[in-house]
Design a protein with these regions (language model features):
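Cys/His-rich finger/ribbon microdomains and the adjacent scaffold used
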Residues: 1-84, 114, 118, 136, ...
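Core structural elements
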Residues: 4, 181-194, 211-221, 238-259, ...
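Acidic, turn-prone loop/beta-hairpin segments
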Residues: 40, 50, 127, 160, ...
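Glycine- and acidic
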Residues: 78-92, 139-144, 164-176, 202-210, ...
């Protein structure tokens, strides 16, 4: 800790406790045991003509008392006994020595112990080019305007998502759009679950492969995300919960659950409700407003913040492996359609090789997700897509003009080969390598 100005003649702050004698010019400062009492006479000559210093302490000396004064110090208050020292202080690295170190000194001096157990330093919020924001540069992003445009939760989530390892944040508005889209995705998923309740008639209560997969992945997610929160790795926690909500829950499980819901499977509806409730809890520290609203609509409970934090359940490795094979089969079919220029909703027939048992055991889910049916025999001519566990073969006859498609592919191949040849010539040129 380096020396710092006692005062910078600011307009507001703690007034300096020094009195000047107008008779002998002595400086009177109360002793520590009487620092709350104003002196009535000069200690040197006894004159009552004392004038207090008109300046105030510098900001950082006043701020150094923040952990104490907010809890009622110097009085021995119940809050001071209960909440000092604090747990975590979150602040920018740029004021580590200006503020944090002075709070540490004040805490040790007045209370005998440091004011915080942990200090979490984050970076500065810069513009998209990495420059500090200033009115003169015209690059200031007004957070109130961002809240109005994207929502408070979106701004909060975007900043958390970007706050990696204390590094500065380059705040591009595209990140706020990402966070807003994520909030919309969550809202629509919750709306789907709530609407699925309406008029639901239970006809069976059997866990599906998708149910088992989602519960297992949720258990893993709870364990990993909780550990990240406890380690104060908030950016990685945001990334993990984003992937769990968007990809695993919305993109795969919600879609895979639709055939079971249509069949009246009560276990699937219950899984949807329970998984969504846990996801809202995991997201609540980052998106408190939306998650509270959705949780109340889902459970009827008003205070999500008072609910117990979720605990991880058991893992189902067999279900995860089987569902992964099913996902790869669906992904392969979708990729084949895209390569052939077919719309995603186009019904096709495919032949699968590899880990195909999960597809056969969950044929209705596969048909719904892939918009495809299975061929009993391997076709002689087909478009092929190989995945780590599944290979899909899709014959093109009857779907498009095969000869025309082949001509387009050959033309594209020639263009790519020509591009590769030009690139090789450039790389072989001494003049190009020297640049």
């Amino acid at each position: 800790v380096k020396d710092w100005n006692i005062s910078r003649q600011l307009w507001w702050g703690h007034q300096i406790p020094a009195w000047y004698c107008e008779d002998c010019q002595a400086v009177n400062v109360p002793k520590p045991e009487r620092y709350l009492e104003d002196p009535t006479s000069c200690e040197a000559c006894g004159s009552p003509r004392l004038k207090r210093d008109e300046d105030v302490f510098d900001t950082w000396f006043s701020s150094a008392l923040w952990p104490l004064s907010t809890l009622g110090w110097p009085e021995e208050t119940e809050d001071l006994k209960a909440f000092y020292p604090g747990d975590v202080l979150v602040t920018g690295y740029d004021i580590l020595f200006l503020w944090v170190s002075r709070m540490e000194v004040s805490g040790y001096h007045f209370m005998g112990e440091r004011p915080f157990k942990t200090v979490l330093l984050h970076g500065l919020v810069l513009d998209e080019k990495g420059q500090k924001m200033s009115k003169s540069k015209g690059n200031v992003i007004d957070p109130l305007e961002m809240v109005e445009r994207y929502g408070a939760d979106a701004l909060r989530f975007a900043l958390t998502y970007l706050a990696t390892g204390g590094q500065d944040i380059r705040l591009d508005l595209r990140w706020l759009e990402m966070a807003r889209n994520f909030a919309n995705k969550l809202y629509n998923a919750a709306r789907f679950v709530l609407l699925s309740r309406e008029g639901f008639q239970a006809k069976e209560d059997t866990p599906t492969l998708a149910d088992r997969f989602m519960r297992s992945r949720l258990s893993q997610g709870v364990e990993e995300i909780t550990a990240l929160y406890e380690a104060l790795d908030l950016a990685q926690a945001a990334r993990e919960v984003y992937e769990l909500v968007w990809s695993e829950f919305c993109d795969w499980y919600l879609e895979a659950a639709k055939p079971a819901l249509k069949a009246g499977n009560a276990h699937t509806l219950r899984t949807l409700e329970e998984v969504l409730a846990v996801l809202l809890k995991l997201l609540h520290p980052m998106m408190p407003f939306l998650t509270s609203e959705l949780y109340q609509a889902l459970t009827g409970k008003e205070e999500l913040a008072l609910e117990a934090w979720p605990e991880p359940g058991g893992r189902d490795d067999k279900a995860e492996r089987a569902f992964e094979a099913l996902k790869q089969a669906v992904t392969a079919v979708r990729a084949l359609k895209a390569e052939a220029g077919l719309p995603p909703a186009q019904e096709v027939r495919v032949y699968l090789e590899g880990e195909t048992a999960p597809v056969g055991e969950n044929l209705e889910v596969f048909r719904f997700l892939a918009r495809a049916d299975l061929l009993p025999e391997r076709p002689a001519k087909a478009l092929v897509k190989a995945m780590p566990r599944v290979t899909a073969r899709m014959p093109l006859e009857g779907l498009l003009d095969v000869e025309e498609w082949r001509r387009r592919q050959e033309k594209r191949l020639k263009e790519l080969l020509a591009l590769a040849e030009r690139s090789q010539r450039k790389l072989a040129s001494p003049g190009f390598r020297e640049k």
